[in-house]
């Protein structure tokens, strides 16, 4: 339990930041899910568009500190490889 005024303020800030970061993470997951669904549908063009729209969201998450840059790079690399394989298949 926060007792001092400073710790009470910090608790309020933490609540706000948690809500914002949760929304950001959710938005990133939504974009990634759209790419996954596009890949599953087998349509290379839709998958490419979904990937192109997901990339800025991932990078924004990195900039805002929601996800680590290596995590974003790994996700983009794996999704790009799958979309590329879909296009060549």
UniProtKB/Swiss-Prot annotation:
Pfam families for this protein: Ribosomal_S20p
GO CC terms of this entry: small ribosomal subunit
Keyword terms of this UniProt record: Ribonucleoprotein, Ribosomal protein, RNA-binding, rRNA-binding
InterPro entries noted in UniProt: Ribosomal_bS20, Ribosomal_bS20_sf
Keyword presence, Ribonucleoprotein: yes
Residue segments, region Disordered: 1-25
Superkingdom, taxonomy of origin: Bacteria
Alphabetized Gene3D superfamilies for the sequence: Ribosomal protein S20 (1.20.58.110)
Family: Belongs to the bacterial ribosomal protein bS20 family.
Function: Binds directly to 16S ribosomal RNA.
PANTHER family in UniProt: 30S RIBOSOMAL PROTEIN S20, SMALL RIBOSOMAL SUBUNIT PROTEIN BS20C
Protein name: Small ribosomal subunit protein bS20
Organism: Paracoccus denitrificans (strain Pd 1222)
Lineage: Bacteria, Pseudomonadati, Pseudomonadota, Alphaproteobacteria, Rhodobacterales
